[in-house]
Amino acid sequence: MGDELAPCPVGTTAWPALIQLISKTPCMPQAASNTSLGLGDLRVPSSMLYWLFLPSSLLAAATLAVSPLLLVTILRNQRLRQEPHYLLPANILLSDLAYILLHMLISSSSLGGWELGRMACGILTDAVFAACTSTILSFTAIVLHTYLAVIHPLRYLSFMSHGAAWKAVALIWLVACCFPTFLIWLSKWQDAQLEEQGASYILPPSMGTQPGCGLLVIVTYTSILCVLFLCTALIANCFWRIYAEAKTSGIWGQGYSRARGTLLIHSVLITLYVSTGVVFSLDMVLTRYHHIDSGTHTWLLAANSEVLMMLPRAMLTYLYLLRYRQLLGMVRGHLPSRRHQAIFTIS
C-alpha cells in the first residue's frame, strides 16, 4: 500500500481511544471485500498521520513525569488522603494515569502492527471507558464538594467526614466500571459484525457511524454521551452558583483570590475534557448524515484521540501544583535542590 492507510472497519467501536491507522496491518478478507461498509476509499497518507503521534508522545511524557509523583505524595500522607479536596484530585490523577497507560499500549500495538485477541480488545475497551468515566465523575464530585462548602457550609461540616471521601471514590469507580461495561458489552452482543472480523484491535471513536451498525450500538454510546453532558450541565450550574456567592460576599473582587484561582483552573480543565466529547458528537452527526468525507472523519478521530484527549491530562498535574502550595512543597521535597528554582506557585 506504500504510503497510504486502509484501516479495517470494526463493527463495535468505542470512544475515547486511539485509531488504529497502520499501513502494515492487513485487513481481513471479509472486510476488504465488503464494499457496503463504505470505507474502502479511506486512504490517508501515513507519513502525515504519524505526525499526530509526536504531540501525543510529548503530552504523555509530560504527564508521566510528574503525575505519579504527585499521586504518591497525596496517598502517602495520611492527612492529605483524608481530605476530599486532595483525595478527589488524586482519583483524577489515577484515572488519567490508567488512560495514559492504556493509550500507550494501544499506540504500541498499532505502530507495531500487533494483533490483540478479542478478549484483550474487550478488556481494553471497558478499561478505557471506565477511566474516562471516572475522570468526569471525579470532576463532578469536586465541584459538588466545593459547592457544598461555599453555599451550604453548615451542611458541609455535618456531611463531610473522613470516610465520606473514600466512599465517594468507591462509588465513582463502581459506577465507572459497571455503567459503561454493561452498555458496551450489550452493544457487542447485539452487533453481529463483531463475529465477522478478525482479531485486530481497532478502537476508532466513531460511535457506530459506519453503515450497518445496529440501533442498540447507537443507543449505547448516545446514553454515555448524555451522562457526560448531564454531568457538564451540573458542573456549569454549580460553578455559576459558586461564582455568584463569591462575588456577593466580596471574595471575588479581592485581587487574586484562592476562590478565583480554583474556579479558573477547574473551568479550563473541565472545558478541555468536555471538548473531546463535543468533537466526538459533532463527528458522529456529520459522518452519519454524510456532511464530511471519510478523510475528514479520520482526521477528526485521530486529532481528537491523539491531541485533545491527551492535552488536559498533561495540564492537570501542573495546574494543581500551581494551585496547592502545600502539595507543591511536598513534591519539591522529593526533587533535587538544584531543581527547586524551576518550580514556582501562583497561589
Swiss-Prot record:
Glycosylation sites: N34
Subcellular location: Cell membrane
Chaperone listed as a keyword: no
Topology of the protein relative to the lipid bilayer: Multi-pass membrane protein
One Gene Ontology term, aspect cellular component: plasma membrane
Family, per entry: Belongs to the G-protein coupled receptor 1 family.
Protein name: Probable G-protein coupled receptor 148
